[in-house]
Design a protein with these regions (language model features):
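Intrinsically disordered, low-complexity proline/glycine-rich segments
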Residues: 2-162
C-alpha cells in the first residue's frame, strides 16, 4: 500500500517594475503569482490594485511613521515603523507581526511571528533591484496584506536615501 504525501506549496509573488511613460516619475510594479498577473502597485500614489479592487496606503507621522492600509475608506491593517530603522510592526487579525531588514543594505526583509521567521521579501540583483522582487509570504495572510508588505518593501527600495 503506497503512502500519500500532501505537499503544501506556497504561491510566491513576484514584482517587476513597469516601464515609465511621460515626464512624471512613475514607479509602478506588476505583481504575478505563478506567471499570472494578480495586481499592480503604484508607489508614487501609494496605492495598489488587486483583483480589480483598489487599496490605498496612507502615511502619518514623521520620525515613527504609521502606514494604514485602506480599501473604500475602511481600515484593514496598520504597520508602524521604528524611528530611523527598516523595522515595522504589523497588526492584523489579532496578531502582531514584525517585518524587518535581514541584510545590511535592506534588500531583503523577513516577516516574523514572535521570533520565528515565516516569510521574506527580496530585491532583485544589485544593479536591477526593482526587477524580480520575490515575496515568499505565509498563505494565512490574505493577498491584500501580502501586497501591503511588498508595497512597504518597494517604498524602502525607492526611497531617496537608497
Amino acid at each position: 500500500m503506497g503512502l500519500i504525501y500532501l505537499l503544501h506549496v506556497r504561491a510566491m509573488l513576484n514584482a517587476n517594475k513597469i516601464s515609465s511613460h511621460g515626464f512624471r516619475k512613475d514607479d509602478r510594479f506588476e505583481v504575478t503569482a505563478c506567471a499570472t498577473v494578480v495586481g499592480t502597485i503604484n508607489d508614487n500614489d501609494s496605492t495598489f490594485e488587486l483583483d480589480k479592487q483598489c487599496f490605498s496606503i496612507t502615511r502619518s507621522g514623521v520620525f515613527a511613521p504609521r502606514f494604514d492600509l485602506k480599501s473604500g475608506g475602511v481600515l484593514i491593517a496598520t504597520a508602524r515603523q521604528k524611528p530611523f530603522r527598516n523595522y515595522y510592526t504589523l497588526a492584523f487579525d489579532g496578531k502582531d507581526w514584525t517585518f524587518k531588514a535581514v541584510v545590511l543594505l535592506a534588500t531583503q526583509f523577513g516577516l516574523f511571528e514572535n521570533d520565528t521567521q515565516r516569510g521574506s521579501v527580496s530585491a532583485g540583483p544589485p544593479l536591477h533591484s526593482l526587477k524580480d522582487i520575490t515575496a515568499d509570504l505565509p498563505d494565512e495572510l490574505p493577498r491584500e496584506i501580502q501586497m501591503f508588505l511588498i508595497s512597504l518593501f518597494v517604498r524602502q527600495l525607492t526611497a531617496p536615501a537608497n
